[in-house]
Every structure is written in C-alpha cells, then in structure tokens.
Amino acid sequence: MSELIPLSEVGVVNPTSATTNRPRRPEWLKARAPGGVNYHDVLRLMREKNLHTVCEEARCPNIGECWNHRTATFLLLGDICTRGCRYCAIGKGKPKPIDEEEPERVAESVAHLRLKFAVLTSVNRDDVPDGGAHIFARTIELIRQKVPDCKVEVLIPDFDGNWDALAMVLDAEPDVLNHNIETVPRLFRRFRPRAKFEQSIELLARARAAHPHLVTKSGMMVGAGETNEEVYEVIDRLREVDVNVLTIGQYLAPDASYWPVHRYVTPAEFADFRAYALARGFRHVESGPLVRSSYNAHLHVGAAQH
C-alpha cells in the first residue's frame, strides 16, 4: 500500500507555509503518493497524445488514486484560461488557437485506456464566439463512435451566458452535465470575478428544462470564508433547479498568492452537508475533505438514474 504523503508533495501547496496566521493543515488532509503501472500508463499516453488533464493542471490530490483506476479528466481547449479565478491553479493568459484535432486524440485515448466512463472539462475560452462548445460536442461524438459503451460526463464552463453554446453541448447527448457553482453568492464575485452566481444557476436550470432525463451535477468548495448556513442555502438553490448530483470538498489554495484558506472543514461537517443534501432530494452526494468534482464520477450516473 502506498504511504500517505502531504498534499504539498503532490502539487497542492499548504497555504499555511507562507503565513503563520492561517490555519494549520489537519492530519486528515493526506493523499496517497501517485505511482503504479496504471498511473504511469496514463501519464505516458497523455504525453504521447499531447493532451492535458485537469488532474495535473489543477494539482488534484486524488491523481494517484484515479489514474490507478485508469480514469482521468481530459482538459479540452488547451491549458491556458482566459479568466483569473482566485482559487484555480490552471494557467491564465492569452491561449493558443483552438486545436481542432484535439477531439480525435481524446477519443483515441479513451479507446486505448478502454474507459467505461470519460470526463471532459475545459479552460474558459472567452476569446472564441462559442466558448469552445463545438470541441465538447465533437469530442462526445467521436467517443461514441470509437467506444460506444463509454459513458461521458462533461464539466462545462458558463460559456459567458451563451445559451446556443450550451445547446450545442447538450445536443451531443452527454450522460452527465456538470457545472460547478464553486462557492456561495456572498463570495462569488471575489472568488470568481468574471462569473455570476445566478448565471450558473440559470445554466443548470436550462439544461434540466431542455433535457428532463439528463443527469445534472454541480459542486462547491468550502473553507474559503463561507458559513455552514450559506452552504445549506446553496444546496437548496441547486435542488430548486433539480440538480441530481452534488460534490463538496475542502478548498486548498495552490500557493500563497491565491485566495486564502479560511478554515479546514471537519469530516463531521462534511457528513452533515451530505446528510442534508440527501434529505433535500439529491440522488448522489460526495462530500469530504479530498472530494473533487470528478472524484468517483463513474459511480454518479448510475446512482442518479435510480
């Protein structure tokens, strides 16, 4: 069994290291050291195909566990984001032109890995009219052609309120439509300066209205300065637009230049969030310190459809 290591050693920097008045990282925030045959097979394939994963770019603490299960979240549209959200480790700036061949390489990788469940996400591409929605749609279509029994989850940006772009993705018929709310309304504009809470809620509502049987999903991070009551209020808002699946995890600052961690939420509090969300009608809830949006994603679609 792999030994437990600090998150900083898998790319998640402990925000207490730069400032002594920030909370000390608790013992329960440990991740397993990445390694193993499957891990290195996935890593090699991503390099060969010149593909990006959010697992690496966002410094996910679960990379070792997920890659050893031969699952990965493909990062479409390059590795440079046009936005500057204060929590995200993905590079910001002027991105390269969209690579129209990327969907083919992703689909080939899904086939090579013999995936039964693929997760597709992307950087924000506010520099192109459809926000890159056509790349999502084409990637879904090619995965369906090459691996017909593979289910597909898309974790999409807000497309800056371009509902035609949303429709383009929905028309490709993903199995799960995920759009993360990320935080509570009070913190939203500081945490995500170029996004709007109500716009994200509207996106999820429109997805449900257009495809009543689609599994919809959202997620948020806690420990960023919100109160537990505000978390419960967001859970209620998401249920109002009939979101099926919810993920809640601990916010971890990539380094001291990002939005600071205000506190470390206890495992007991995460259990309370999960119990409340299930009582409100969510069909599946992942809630825990190391939970990320795509964690155990292959389990969500089946649970949500029952």
UniProtKB/Swiss-Prot annotation:
Cofactor binding notes: Binds 2 [4Fe-4S] clusters per subunit. One cluster is coordinated with 3 cysteines and an exchangeable S-adenosyl-L-methionine.
Enzyme class of the recorded protein, top EC level: transferase
A UniProt-annotated Pfam family: Radical_SAM
CDD domains: Radical_SAM
Gene Ontology CC terms: cytoplasm
Keywords: 4Fe-4S, Cytoplasm, Iron, Iron-sulfur, Metal-binding, S-adenosyl-L-methionine, Transferase
GO molecular function: 4 iron, 4 sulfur cluster binding; lipoate synthase activity; metal ion binding
Subcellular location: Cytoplasm
Domain Radical SAM core, first and last residues per copy: 67-283
Pathway(s): Protein modification; protein lipoylation via endogenous pathway; protein N(6)-(lipoyl)lysine from octanoyl-[acyl-carrier-protein]: step 2/2
Residues annotated for [4Fe-4S] cluster 2 binding in this entry: 81, 85, 88
Catalytic activity: [[Fe-S] cluster scaffold protein carrying a second [4Fe-4S](2+) cluster] + N(6)-octanoyl-L-lysyl-[protein] + 2 oxidized [2Fe-2S]-[ferredoxin] + 2 S-adenosyl-L-methionine + 4 H(+) = [[Fe-S] cluster scaffold protein] + N(6)-[(R)-dihydrolipoyl]-L-lysyl-[protein] + 4 Fe(3+) + 2 hydrogen sulfide + 2 5'-deoxyadenosine + 2 L-methionine + 2 reduced [2Fe-2S]-[ferredoxin]
UniProt similarity note: Belongs to the radical SAM superfamily. Lipoyl synthase family.
Protein's name according to its UniProt entry: Lipoyl synthase
Gene this chain is encoded by: lipA
